[in-house]
């Protein structure tokens, strides 16, 4: 169940290196909705940023998720459920010459999971501001619980290290490199999820037992990106990302995008992303027997699968408002369409001979609506 805390884990990457410039004073109101695979997640978010003395900046964010899940994992081994997650974040930035220091803290809480994270990032402009180097680390400590079992309580400790480099190669071309390493230790599997194994004594031909994961995991990701600005204020961008971990997963991501301004008030965006990964060493859709090996997983996100995403978006800068304290404002809408196809995860709800059921796949939609104001 806790996997719903991350709507789009495939899209996550190390933060890009950024110039040592404080963000503008602004407020953003967001509504986001995800629908796909029997899961619906939606909720609002509010983010406010404010500068002080041109050297300091603070930010605060609140986000609320409403989750309704009847995913294939849930309907085959449990019951559909609904829950709410609340996330609070606080951050501060300090600018000292060409160096920016950023400290952030995030708390997320739901009925069976509490997550806390603190991070420090440093960004430095070099070589006449044409190059930016950034590095940082984050520490997370989570508590995993299980609804219906008050005695169940496990922990997860996580360390994240990241490095970023961006460079202006020429007046129209920006390039970047990001590298990230994450180490996890603790209870890393889902307490609700089960694996299935061949059971001749069962009418279905198989039975279930709880998943068992290793209690450690180290993953690393490297990404190369580039953005080229066209003469008519448009831009094209591309990124390649490689991911690998100690569980045997290797993944590749390719993203291409185009941004096009229209007039003085409109900006349109088009994005395509392709993702492909191999399965974890201890994953199987159907194990030959109970306790077939030390570690057991049937989470489809640890299987071999491919996804495609096509996204479109538009931003409209609003005319001046009657409120003098708002310098400018805009409205943005983004829509992403995902397709997931699994190579070794089968849809057991379709019936059939165990291990020969149809392969699973589903479509998902993500909607995002922003209202932003600068003051």
Map each language-model feature to its residues.
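Short loop/turn motifs that connect adjacent beta-strands in outer-membrane beta-barrel proteins
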Residues: 18-24, 55, 98, 127-131, ...
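Transmembrane beta-strands of outer-membrane beta-barrel proteins
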Residues: 25-29, 58-60, 101-103, 131-135, ...
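Transmembrane beta-strands of outer-membrane beta-barrel pores
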Residues: 31-35, 64-68, 96-98, 107-111, ...
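Extracellular loop and loop/strand-boundary signature of outer-membrane beta-barrel proteins
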Residues: 31-34, 74-79, 104-108, 119-121, ...
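Residues that define the transmembrane beta-barrel architecture of outer-membrane proteins
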Residues: 40-44, 82-88, 95, 114-118, ...
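Residue-level signature of outer-membrane beta-barrel architecture
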Residues: 50, 92-96, 124, 167, ...
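Outer-membrane beta-barrel translocator/channel fold
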Residues: 61-91, 130-189, 193-194, 218, ...
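Outer-membrane beta-barrel "beta-signal"
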Residues: 122, 172, 312-316, 362-375
């Amino acid at each position: 169940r806790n996997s719903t805390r991350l709507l789009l884990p495939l899209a996550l990457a190390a933060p890009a290196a950024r110039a040592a410039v404080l963000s503008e004073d602004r407020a953003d109101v967001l509504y986001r909705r995800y629908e796909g695979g029997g899961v619906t997640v939606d909720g609002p978010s509010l983010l406010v940023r404010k500068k002080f003395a041109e050297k300091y900046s603070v930010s605060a964010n609140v986000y609320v998720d409403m989750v309704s899940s009847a995913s294939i994992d849930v309907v085959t081994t449990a019951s559909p459920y609904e829950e709410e997650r609340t996330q609070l974040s606080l951050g501060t930035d300090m600018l000292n010459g060409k160096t920016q220091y950023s400290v952030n803290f995030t708390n997320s809480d739901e009925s069976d999971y509490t997550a806390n994270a603190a991070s420090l990032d440093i960004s430095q402009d070099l070589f006449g501001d044409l190059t930016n180097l950034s590095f940082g680390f984050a520490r997370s400590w989570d508590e995993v619980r299980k609804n219906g079992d008050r005695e169940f309580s496990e922990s997860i400790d996580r360390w994240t290290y990241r490095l970023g480099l961006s460079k202006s190669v020429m007046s129209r071309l920006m390039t970047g490199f990001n590298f990230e390493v994450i180490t996890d230790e603790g209870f890393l599997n889902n307490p609700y999820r089960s694996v299935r194994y061949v059971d001749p004594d069962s009418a279905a031909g198989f039975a279930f037992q709880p998943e068992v994961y290793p209690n450690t995991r180290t993953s690393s990701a490297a990404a190369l990106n580039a953005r080229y600005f066209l003469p008519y204020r448009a831009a094209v961008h591309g990124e390649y990302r490689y991911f690998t971990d100690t569980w045997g997963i290797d993944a590749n991501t390719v993203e291409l995008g185009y941004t096009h301004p229209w007039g003085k008030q409109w900006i349109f965006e088009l994005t395509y992303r392709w993702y492909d990964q191999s399965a974890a060493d201890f994953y199987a859709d159907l194990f030959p027997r109970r306790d077939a090996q030390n570690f057991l997983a049937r989470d489809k996100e640890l299987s071999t699968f491919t996804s495609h995403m096509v996204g479109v978006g538009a931003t409209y800068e609003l005319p001046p408002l009657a409120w003098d304290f708002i310098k400018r404002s805009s409205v943005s809408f983004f829509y992403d369409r995902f397709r997931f196809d699994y190579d070794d995860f089968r849809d057991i709800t379709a019936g059939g001979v165990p291990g020969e059921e149809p392969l699973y796949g589903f479509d998902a939609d993500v909607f995002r609506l922003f209202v932003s104001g600068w003051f």
